[in-house]
Regions:
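Walker A/P-loop-proximal flanking segment of P-loop NTPase domains
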Residues: 1-55, 64, 75, 122, ...
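Alpha-helix boundary/N-cap detector
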Residues: 2, 65, 79-82, 86, ...
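An amphipathic alpha-helix signature
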Residues: 4, 63-68, 175, 206-207
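Charge-rich, solvent-exposed alpha-helical interaction surfaces
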Residues: 6, 73, 87-90, 114, ...
Length: 207
């Protein structure tokens, strides 16, 4: 479809946008587009992760399973060496700090720095030329607030060269999340603030 083609074009950029919203349309539209997108990306020889939030409904936070899936994919792209294993250990050790509320700020800053530098190194080793596309879907079924929190988490902690996240969300759900979080932002305002590109079902807006 035209919508799929827009996202494929973004993935083909030398410097793909790190966070793309697939916004609007019906749930069926979004599911079909993501399924086509996944097939087309595989056909183009890209690495793709399909992160389906519905599998993690029992988790109180989606960021940690998302990190684990990314690390597993990066590891599998690479013959595991001592250096790779060490980076994976360092990521696993420091990832919980990204959402921790009980660490001292000094400890947290140190661990977040470790997380950031280790994940960047692992990505650089594993993703030589082609980007890794991570599709995040199923947020329609997760607790209210999940879309905003995972989007902000990706923007803050996973903005890494060669990672391209595609997060799918409907208009009504985003409006509900913003209303329930007492945010004064409009859905468009939120998307423009947090995402690097927004793909809708009739046109494309890229800042």
């Amino acid at each position: 479809t035209a919508t799929t083609a827009k996202i494929i074009t973004l993935a083909g950029n030398p410097n793909p946008p790190s966070l793309v919203a697939l916004y609007g349309g019906s749930l069926g539209d979004r599911k079909t587009t993501l399924s086509d997108l996944e097939n087309d990306l595989y056909a183009a020889g890209l690495s793709v992760i399909d992160f389906n939030s519905r599998r993690f409904l029992s988790e109180n936070d989606l960021s940690q399973p998302l990190i684990q899936q990314i690390v597993t994919e990066l590891k599998s792209n690479q013959d595991t060496t001592g250096a790779t294993a060490d980076l994976v250990n360092r990521i696993n050790e420091s990832a919980p700090a990204t959402i921790s509320t009980h660490l001292t700020s000094e400890n947290r800053i140190e661990l977040i720095h470790q997380f950031d530098s280790s994940l960047k190194k692992l990505a650089a080793i594993s993703l030589q030329k082609k980007p890794l596309v991570i599709i995040v879907q199923g947020l329609e079924r997760t607790p209210t607030g999940s879309f905003i929190s995972i989007s902000e988490f990706i923007a803050n902690y996973l903005n890494i060269h060669k990672f391209m996240f595609v997060v799918s969300i409907g208009e009504e759900i985003l409006q509900n999340e913003l209303t329930s979080s007492n945010s004064q932002m409009s859905p468009d305002g939120f998307l423009e603030d947090v995402f690097s590109a927004i793909v809708t079902f009739d046109e494309i807006a890229v800042d």
